[in-house]
Design a protein with these regions (language model features):
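C-terminal amphipathic helix plus adjacent low-complexity
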Residues: 1-35, 39-42, 384-435
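Active-site and donor-binding regions of nucleotide-sugar-utilizing enzymes
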Residues: 1-244
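Conserved catalytic-core segment of nucleotide-activated headgroup transferases in glycan assembly
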Residues: 91-93, 238-308
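Catalytic donor nucleotide-activated moiety binding site of glycosyltransferases and closely related
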Residues: 135-141, 176-179, 286-318, 361
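Short acidic active-site motifs
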Residues: 159, 204-205, 320-324, 381
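Catalytic binding pocket for nucleotide-activated donors in carbohydrate/polymer assembly enzymes
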Residues: 213, 234-235, 239, 338-409
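Donor nucleotide-activated moiety binding/catalytic core segment of transferases
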Residues: 297-341, 345-346, 355-357
Length: 435
């Protein structure tokens, strides 16, 4: 047993890879507060709540799955976006089951997802003191700064390993490669010899963990280039476009001029800057209809902003998916979000405008550098770009997305779902896993 802490610590560090990057540590206090509060006492309080509501709470919440998980292809999801990215595989792989960890919030899809029991997770917290000490020696003060995130990650690997041994799924398909529970399941699959596949569900950055699946279905060359910068690429890779966009590509925006402008924001975008931007555009371009769409995970109080700017419309991301939102817009203004790519695919004119000034996240996805979207450096520049688009919007903006979406301009354009399903089925067959 004395030889185990080394491998165990390395595994935990792998699971927490994103939490110890410079870019994560440099997130704004407002963004970090919802993940890991700055105050040690608040972090400790959240750990206490986790113990009561999750670790102890799960003991009194038995998991009763309607679908049989034995020998099935698991589609592992951590969010509603993940669900939408993987749901199409169910039609192509009879018996495929959407699964998530016990208590995971999948939004409006909670009732459609089977749960993996986490009741035994509490048994593995004897590891925590040694793990935190080991991470302190390796990572320094960041281990203490994020002691709550380290706490949450304990036990996933062991519990998921037990579930894999019990159910023996034919394969596990992921749409997330960096959340702690997803990474723990990936590592457990490697240990138990379960084949793994990955379907990219959003744009990626060079700060992600190395691509570590047996099969990776990426959207385009951009994603592959970035993953190569992250480290060695494991397994097979296929470029299949964006499956979740298929149904919408035939309904691209044909408006000759911009009348409706959507602003997408997330927790990284300060509310004062959002208010300033909306107020400026409402005054400078009064003919435009403005709609604000907060990210579904953004739980800040937008009430004062609603009262300050009653003319602004709102999109509820919990009820309206991103493509449904974009279908109601002619232009998009946003900072660092993959919505820029989704907008461009629908020929919605998209503009990169930063509401915050963190230098580590400037052009985080490289959209400006690769010519996908123009940058507005300040409010007058943003107003000028939108003013020009209000007179004329090009009809061929979507061609800019070819580097990000491998099927654009090919016979498979708008058919990424059957392409991905075919590649996945062939891989399962070649791996000796019945499709």
């Amino acid at each position: 047993m004395r030889s185990e802490p080394g491998p165990r610590l390395a595994r935990l560090r792998d699971i927490l890879q994103m939490r110890f990057t410079d870019i994560f540590a440099a997130m704004s206090p407002a963004a970090l507060s919802g993940i890991s509060p700055a105050s040690p006492l608040r972090r400790l309080a959240r750990v206490g709540a986790y113990v009561v509501l999750r670790l102890v709470g799960h003991l009194f919440q038995p998991v009763r799955n309607q679908a049989d998980l034995h020998g099935a292809v698991w589609l592992y999801v951590v969010s509603a976006n993940n669900y939408e990215a993987l749901q199409f595989i169910q039609g192509a792989q009879p018996g495929a089951v959407l699964v998530a960890g016990q208590g995971k919030n999948i939004g409006r899809y909670n009732g459609a997802v089977r749960q993996l029991s986490l009741r035994r997770k509490v048994l593995h917290y004897w590891q925590y003191p040694g793990a935190l000490a080991g991470l302190w020696r390796r990572e320094g003060p960041r281990a203490w700064r994020f002691f709550d995130l380290v706490f949450y990650a304990i036990g996933y690997y062991e519990v998921y390993g037990r579930a894999l041994r019990h159910y023996r799924p034919r394969a596990v398909v992921f749409a997330n490669d960096h959340n702690d529970d997803a990474r723990a399941l990936l590592l457990a699959c490697r240990t138990e010899g379960i084949p793994t596949a990955y379907v990219q569900h959003a744009s990626v950055s060079a700060n992600f963990p190395p691509l570590g699946f047996d099969l990776s279905l990426l959207e385009g060359q951009d994603a592959l280039d970035k993953y190569r910068r992250c480290g060695p690429v494991r397994g097979q890779v296929a470029l299949v476009g964006m499956p979740k966009a298929d149904v919408y590509l035939a309904r691209r925006n044909q408006a000759p001029a911009v009348c409706r402008v959507g602003l997408a924001c997330n927790i990284h975008d300060p509310l004062p800057a959002l208010a300033e931007t909306l107020a400026y555009l409402a005054q400078a371009l009064p003919a435009l209809t403005l709609t604000l769409r907060p990210h579904p995970s953004d739980t800040r109080d937008f009430g004062p902003l609603r009262r300050q700017l009653p003319q602004v419309q709102w999109s509820d991301a919990r009820r309206q998916n991103v493509f449904e939102f974009l279908e109601t817009q002619d232009a998009l203004v946003a900072a660092d979000t993959s919505t820029h790519l989704e907008a461009t695919l629908l020929n919605v004119a998209s503009i990169y405008y930063r509401f915050a000034a963190n230098p580590l996240t400037d052009d985080y996805y490289g959209y400006v550098a690769h010519g996908l979207v123009p940058r507005a450096a300040d409010l007058p520049a943003l107003g000028a770009l939108l003013g020009a688009l209000a007179h004329h919007k090009p009809a061929d903006l979507y061609y800019r997305a070819a580097y990000y979406n491998a099927t654009l301009g090919t016979p498979d354009e708008g058919r990424s779902q059957p392409l991905a399903a075919r590649v996945l089925g062939e891989w399962l067959g070649a791996a000796g896993v019945p499709a």
